[in-house]
Amino acid sequence: DIKSSNKVINAWCMYDWANSVYSLVITTAIFPIYYNAVTTSSTGSYIVSFFGIEIVNSVLYSYSLSFSFLLLTVIQPILSGIADYSGNKKLFLRLFMYLGSASCMSLYFFDGNNVEFGIICSVFASIGFTGSLVFYNAFLPEISSEKDFDKISARGYSFGYVGSVILLIICLIIIQKFDVFGFPDSQSATKFTFLLVGIWWISFSQLTLYYLPQKNKGIKITLDVLTYGTKELIKVWNYIKNFKNLKLYLFSYFFYSMGVQTIMLIASYFGDKELNLDQSKLI
């Protein structure tokens, strides 16, 4: 029985181990600092050109992340409909995983002279990461009983924290001791860590893809399938409208979550521009 199979459950948790390095290394700890450093001119100017538009580097990066989140808000109901209605969850998990990891590795070629390329790669990495999570989470009912959802989800989170911290430590050692590893400067070492993130993500995801079940229902992706997720969201909204406390909780959690994520995403810029912290302290 696939459900409650420890091997399958651990394989599912390994995707958290694989993809959480994106959250920690790319969105939080290293890439924002690198981006800010390479897009700041020698005179200290923060202005960059993005397809001919002059804009402050941190504002551009914030807008790009906002755009990726807005786009994901639109497509997530569609993705969830595909995940619930069809049996192609593994295929879409694989596609979004490769999109995200390849985008992370492509950041190796971003050096500040090709701002458009770096921003586009970071947007695709965000889409790949979040899109893959839709199909990853959709596997949970297939591999576990409902009573074990919380326990297995917690195990996945713990795998993610451990895996991402391990790679972050490796990346920091490479950056701080770049000469020991044969890099000419810390910038080259930092770019190499983006390659490591993509390789880590792809490599450990193979365990997940190998052991997770494939249940192809043979259902074609029609308009009904694409709108299924949106219809379900409307049903849920009509249901929770009758529960005042639940509505208050969800709205409160929304603003709390957005606040925490905003701090995580822009803390490095605040530390650099407002507090003038050294890059090593920012990391």
Spans of features found by a protein language model:
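Cytoplasmic membrane-interface "Motif A"-like loop-to-helix N-cap segments
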Residues: 83-99
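Juxtamembrane intracellular "pre-TM" segments in multi-pass secondary transporters
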Residues: 1-10, 213-251, 274
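Cytoplasmic helix-loop-helix junction between adjacent transmembrane helices
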Residues: 121, 125-158
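C-terminal ends and interior cores of transmembrane alpha-helices
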Residues: 73, 94-113
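Glycine-rich segments within core transmembrane alpha-helices of 12-TM secondary carriers
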Residues: 153-175
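Central cavity-lining transmembrane alpha-helices of secondary-active solute carriers
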Residues: 26, 30, 55-81, 102, ...
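C-terminal membrane-cytosol helix-exit motif in multi-pass small-molecule transporters
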Residues: 167-180, 198-218
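Short amphipathic helix-loop junctions that connect adjacent transmembrane helices
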Residues: 24-58, 265-282
